[in-house]
Amino acid sequence: MWNLNWYNIWKYSLPKFWEEIPLIFAIVDEYSEKYRAIIDRNRDINLYSLSLAVRRQENGGKGIEFGVMAAKGTDLEEQARWAVVTFLKNIERWERATREGSWKPQYPNRELDYITYLGNRWAPIGASNDPAGLNQYWIPNVQRLYLLYKR
């Protein structure tokens, strides 16, 4: 159903993440129903794998689990909700930008191209809240984890 590589999820995730998976997947399921048209147009983008990859990359503590600053100080559920809705809204933006020519695909693989688009918005290089310059690693790390986690 989820088309995931459970061995890699176990191997490349920390034990603290394992207990979060049911909640994260329930939220993905909930919003997948609400945004069914987006999901249907982009069946190749695995939101389960993407959610786990972003959670692992952000590695945030309580109240900032997904790195969503707009929901800072909340909890895993609220962070996951903001993250999943952000993924879905950015799929729409990516589709529109690609269609209108303001985004030139950078990968032949649509999934990796979308993650690149998302990463430019989610973790922009040179952002004021990234003084150590770690955002430069966000896109390649999320792409790698995404591919490891999906089947």
Predicted regions and their residues:
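Non-catalytic cell-wall polysaccharide-engagement segments
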Residues: M1-E19, A26-Y31, A70-R151
